[in-house]
């Protein structure tokens, strides 16, 4: 399987994963479980980091370096120096120590940090955090600012020689002096990466890694990468750069996967790529790189290579002239179009300087760039990962050399990433002894480490060389088409970065806005019931919404029961959300209008419930109707403040799952009796003035009669509610409690307490009424059985009028 098929296979798999978002969550959950298992089983011990003298050197107690891969310091500058620092080596494509992943230095480890940088000859430091984040110190400042006095860290002196600001990061040129030796170290400080989160765009990260590889093109010395803990953001940069190196050299294995890569990296330092969002960021970055490379391959196979004959000599002459320059790259312009134009002008200008030397160089490089026939002999084995293998404390780094050291690493012709995304790096200076440039134009003689093995190379060595020479004679120079494809790829706009955004992502974004709108409105309505579980707060999947919920939601938008301040601004968004998933029973305007008409009909009849819904009495007299009408006379006098308060309490008890129309009717029934009772209880004298009493009883005073009549009317109202709507009382807990409270307050003992607090005159007249009641009980026991004492325990309406009414 060639590189084109491998890339296409990965793109197809990634597209399916983006459609089913759960796969990302499942994969990251496996990574977390793996780390938990390693920690519980002590698969990779951290005994050195747990020593008492080293505990204070760890920023976080749960991010400790594994013993077998930790960075050991041997450069001793004082008696207090030790060999410990919270840092690990991370394997690269061509070496076991390609990266140093470390935490942000503490105030007590600044000297250790610079000892590590100096001992391992680090040229590049990548900082992926801020000095302060969320009000907390994330990293001590180990660098100097431009124009600032040099900083002293033990025997090390650090000063800033220059600073280059990009849109999202800063490149600082630091001069570090130790004893009498001075070195130049470059710090890439990424400033727009939030902690435990991801940047909003992939482009700045790819640009950062691009610039890093312009300054250091290979793994001859490790690149130091750190954030605050040295695991989350640090792991993202390591994983992207590792994959980019594979892609550039054309050695993506058939079974390549981001999951396997990060799982292997987590065996070298704990919690690399710390969150699921960071995991998806790595996936998206790799996906973008693969898409760009596939565009180059498609254009290359369309026959555009015939347009270039002398582009390789011209380009290589530029490399020949610039490769010995002591200065670092001057053009790493972000605008790809301008860079391509400058590159074209440079090639036209230098076309006259073509000589035999450059043609000879290009002829040699054709051996590397065009192994057309011999490329089929390269079969890549599985990633050499030992995921579940137990590691000893004496575990050693192992490297695997090529079968013949010094033999060029042959690369596929279509994977020249130097002309693809690193055109600004043409003047990078060589680092390794073999003169391997970052744009991969010369043979690679580096020994190979664990990630991959090339098989059948011994058997095909002689055949490959012959085929390459024969191919060189039969084919013209064709790297100019790479140049042209580079121009095409470098024009990738930000819209192309979102090319991989499937329907699911956009769909999810739309759903998220609607869900947010629904939650805000639901919170306003149900914010008064923290102790009652409500089905609307549960997560509702897009395709599993029931019709009960969809019936309740539109009714809440009407505003007839709840206060207007609690209503959402628009009710159409909720309907559009359900309609988009075909799960709403109300998916037509006629259904909505019919529902509103039903509500208006119920509300129109609600104010006349006293007349239309009498208690079911076997024999009813006209006087009993007159008593109920008197009870309803006081309801218009209820203050608005009390009404709104009662409404809120009723509205929070919407817990049952049936249709909402009976609930609207119940709410209005609850409001009117409870309001009228509360206001009439302390004002019985007003009640006497405004209503005509029934025929006087022979042995009762007017005051005692009105107390009994109040309770009678209260019981009448309670009976109306309880007999008409038993289901609502069973299913609404808070409504029952609201109803019981005023009911109990109007027993004889509690009514006397209220009257004692409000008016002493009424309180004084209450005790004489009790003998009158006992007398009345002898004459009219049937009336007392249905009134006052039994009304609130067994709410029943009056069956017969008092015998003294002379009807």
Curated annotation (Swiss-Prot):
Residues reported to bind substrate: 227-233, 274
PTM description: Phosphorylation on Ser-35 by PKC/PRKCD abrogates its ability to dephosphorylate and inactivate the SRC family kinases.
GO BP terms in the entry: autophagy; cellular response to muramyl dipeptide; lipid metabolic process; lipopolysaccharide-mediated signaling pathway; negative regulation of autophagy; negative regulation of gene expression; negative regulation of interleukin-6 production; negative regulation of interleukin-8 production
GO cellular component, as recorded: cytoplasm; cytoplasmic side of plasma membrane; cytosol; nucleus; perinuclear region of cytoplasm
Record's note on what induces expression: By muramyl-dipeptide and lipopolysaccharide.
Gene Ontology MF annotations: kinase binding; non-membrane spanning protein tyrosine phosphatase activity; phosphatase activity; protein tyrosine phosphatase activity; SH3 domain binding; ubiquitin protein ligase binding
Activity-regulation annotation: Down-regulated by phosphorylation.
Main location: cytoplasm
Annotated spans, Disordered: 676-700, 724-746
Database matches in SUPFAM superfamilies: (Phosphotyrosine protein) phosphatases II
Keywords for the protein's UniProt record, in alphabetical order: Autophagy, Cytoplasm, Diabetes mellitus, Disease variant, Disulfide bond, Hydrolase, Immunity, Lipid metabolism, Phosphoprotein, Protein phosphatase, Systemic lupus erythematosus
Family of the protein in this entry: Belongs to the protein-tyrosine phosphatase family. Non-receptor class 4 subfamily.
Subunit composition and interactions: Interacts with CSK. Interacts with LPXN. Interacts with CBL. Interacts with TRAF3 (via MATH domain); the interaction promotes TRAF3 polyubiquitination.
Name under which the protein is recorded: Tyrosine-protein phosphatase non-receptor type 22
Organism: Homo sapiens (Human)
Gene name for this UniProt entry: PTPN22
